[in-house]
Amino acid sequence: QMSAGYDDKSPAMPVPGPMGPMGPRGPPGSPGASGPQGFTGPPGEPGEAGPSGAMGPRGPAGPPGKNGEDGESGKPGRGGERGPPGPQGARGFSGLDGAKGDSGPAGPKGESGAPGENGTPGAMGPRGNDGAAGAAGPPGPTGPAGPPGFPGGPGAKGDAGAQGGRGPEGPAGARGEPGNPGPAGAAGPSGNPGTDGAAGPKGTPGAAGVAGAPGFPGPRGPSGPQGAAGAPGPKGNTGEVGAPGAKGEAGAKGEAGAPGVQGPPGPSGEEGKRGARGEPGAAGARGGPGGRGFPGSDGPAGPKGATGERGAPGAVGPKGATGEPGRTGEPGLPGAKGMTGSPGSPGPDGKTGAAGPSGQDGRPGPPGPVGARGQPGVMGFPGPKGAAGEGGKPGERGVMGPTGAAGAPGKDGDVGAPGPSGPAGPAGERXXXGPAGAPGFQGLPGPGEQGLPGEAGATGPAGARGAPGALGPAGARGSPGSSGNDGAKGDAGAPGAPGAQGPPGLQGMPGERGAAGLPGLRGDRGDQGAKGADGAPGKDGPRGLTGPLGLPGPAGATGDKGEPGPAGPVGPGGARGAPGERGESGPPGPAGFAGPPGADGQPGAKGEAGDNGAKGDAGPPGAAGPTGAPGPQGPVGNTGPKGARGAAGPPGATGFPGAAGRVGPPGPSGNPGPPGPAGGTGKEGPKGNRGETGPAGRTGEVGAAGPPGPAGEKGSPGAEGATGSAGLPGPQVGLPGQRGERXXPGLPGPAGEPGKPGPSGPGGERGPPGPMGPPGLAGAPGEPGREGSPGNEGSAGRDGAAGPKGDRGESGPSGAPGAPGPPGAPGPVGPAGKNGDRGETGPAGPAGSAGPAGPRGPAGAPGLRGDKGESGEAGERGFTGMQGPPGPSGSSGEQGPAGAAGPAGPRGPAGSAGSPGKDGMSGLPGPTGPPGPRGGFDLGFLSQPQEKAPDPFRDRDLEVDSTLKSLSQQLEQLRSPDGTRSGEYWLDPDQGCTEDALKFTYSVLEDGCTSHTGTWGK
């Protein structure tokens, strides 16, 4: 068009001369009209990755990838609730380490991803401070009836109840042991007749003997029929905690709790191991058109045209009007890769990343100082049935718990112990009589006020004991009496030999939480727990270290185009690109006329920003950018190898009360209560067995002479008299004389031998009933009751209040270098150079050879926007986003079965002496001794003052008692040591070979503190 302009001014058409040399480059023309659309150029090199689009919706889960190797353990996270043990998974294969990819630029923050699945529970964190007490929860379901409690303390005496009906006749009691010798009884029946005495006067009747001591109380009669309901008694003390019930059925899954308060940031985890290299991601969607490339350098001069004929030089024409702008040139080829830019300034701190994975358990540290007293642990499973323990003292009254919500009705439990009397209800209609309940434990008698006077009772008991009569002679030694009450606790005896291990005791109440124990040896990894209940989302943790690239997730669906972000700061100018490839030769243009050199123009306005240069090499890692939104959940990895056993979780909430345990054996007898009021006269009991013959009574005073006895037998002939001197010879035999008179009786002969005892006389009248024997021994324990059926599910408890902020964790190790920061702001524009001086206009000379090219004219107005190029190839894959926040926990699985009982521990050292036991039962009577020599009888001792001789057996009894008590104390101290003795003990972790046992020393220091020190065994 320039040449056309000159033609218009020419007066004549000269013959064209040969083409002159190429003139200097003319100033840029004005923009030309838009040309027709050019052909689609070849695809450009991939442009730089554009800014990330908004996060698309979460794509479907991809197939599970292979597991990477276990990362190194992070610091303990906050304690998760301990799930029940799950089944043990198989060990997966270790993935290969991938090579580290180049760091991509940080993309803009995406929208928050969907919550990821729950992470595995972290190791138990340090114990937080006690939280404030939560609000009272809704009432829990009614638990099954607990076992009968121990007898409570004496209650206030209630009003006298109505007199119950007379109970049925009790069975005859067992035969009691002989009582102590009573005072002398009245004279026995007459003996066999003595030898005749002189008849004496009748003696006066003896004084009545002293009344015998009251007999022992009879055995307890069966319960009478139920009396009318008494007025409600005061509320009793809280019973002892029942034994844990059998495992309940799994409760229904509770609704997800409201999110808890954001927790404080957890401590930084340690850097995880490098993950395995991810598989290549799927090809991304085709990118948008790349930015316009820099203009290529000038192409080489075209081939020289044929030389035209030289024209006559024309006069210099005036400067033509600015031509229309030319068509937009084809996009130049992309420039070579620019030099690496200088690192940008560090970006702002990113959001706190998720806590890293748990680290492996470290070696056991040295014992820490004794921690604060922990909360009570979870109630254990019921232990085996132990021997009956001694009755404990009544505990202090517990705080009243909140009322629980009514649960679903449970299955019928065993008959419970009688509860306290309720207030009297309205009188119901008469119903059929129900079955009698099991008798409850005997309560301690309570002190009370005077009851209302009852109706006139039957004949009262025997009157007050009279003054003691004269002391009778010592009777035969009676059988040993029943054992007395425990004496006062004696001093501790010398330590006895260790006794055999006793049967396990009943499960005690949970003790207060002890001080923190020494770190145990590392146990085997527990089975994988089932998914825990949903936890409340925690607060953002502190920023974690940049994790290794995750496996690529499946491509998400294309998201909607995000709103345009605010313009970023201008990047620094890239280094000058290398010259582009040589362009194709353009067609030779017509020769322009050389214009005179124009004066230097003023500096042009600042040009528009050039197109983006090609992607530079990866710069050094910048400071970590802000945390991106969580990427989509990666596929589930293979199961890792079995990890170390985690630390014990914090104590769980107290479980529901267990089902009632079996009835334990009867406890020891309580101290005898004060005597109850006199009962009504019972029916006459059955005839008792005949009592043993009592000891001989005191000899009575000599009675008066009896009436004369019958005539004695004729005495034996007397001795022959001495021979008289011979008489005179009588007459011849005379006639027989008359019978003489009866002679007087002869002198009484000596007393005959006593006759043999006569046959036993008829049975005497029935004697008075003997004293009541002592109560019989406790019967054998009843058969255990059937196990109660489990109660219905309880309703889920409310979420507890958020705990207080935990203590600050220890600082983690220094993190790895962060990802590159965003580019720094461009440096300030340098000052413009000074304008050169304007040259003077020279005279117009003849057309010389072409002058040097003038300075480049100012840029033309921008051309119209070219057509959209084809999409560039997909850019390199960006970094995986940070892990999303943990999703809500799944419902808790059913509780696993209880583990098998562990092996028995090694036998402990002998404890100090136990307290002495109660007096033992009396032994059987010994065999009868040989008869002693027959003694005489001396009444002289009756006149001497009577004193009881020392009991030769008593000293030996005391010795046995003290030994028993000392042994009992030693056993008691073995069972529950009081922590006042220093000493050494061993712990064998696997209870097998003793080579790995640990020896500990327990020291009680002077200030009351204690210390544990441990040493390895061989």
Curated annotation (Swiss-Prot):
Localization per Swiss-Prot or TrEMBL: Secreted, Extracellular space, Extracellular matrix
Taxonomic superkingdom: Eukaryota
Biased composition (Pro residues): 13-30, 138-151, 665-677, 819-829
Low complexity bias (residue ranges): 31-58, 126-136, 171-214, 223-261, 370-385, 424-442, 452-510, 543-558, 591-627, 641-663, 701-746, 775-795, 843-862, 889-925
GO biological process annotation, one example: extracellular matrix organization
Coarse class of the protein's main subcellular location: secreted
Composition bias, Polar residues: 963-973
Pfam families: Collagen
Fibrillar collagen NC1 domain location: 932-1018
PROSITE patterns assigned to the protein according to its UniProt record, in alphabetical order: NC1_FIB (PS51461)
Keywords per UniProt: Collagen, Disulfide bond, Extracellular matrix, Secreted
Biased composition (Basic and acidic residues): 1-10, 67-81, 865-876, 948-959
InterPro entries given in the database record: Collagen, Collagen_superfamily, Fib_collagen_C
Disordered, as annotated region: 1-991
An annotated GO cellular component: extracellular matrix
MF (Gene Ontology): extracellular matrix structural constituent conferring tensile strength
Residue spans of biased composition, Gly residues class: 152-170, 284-296, 568-577
Family: Belongs to the fibrillar collagen family.
Protein name, entry field: Collagen, type I, alpha 1a
Organism, as annotated: Epinephelus costae (Goldblotch grouper)
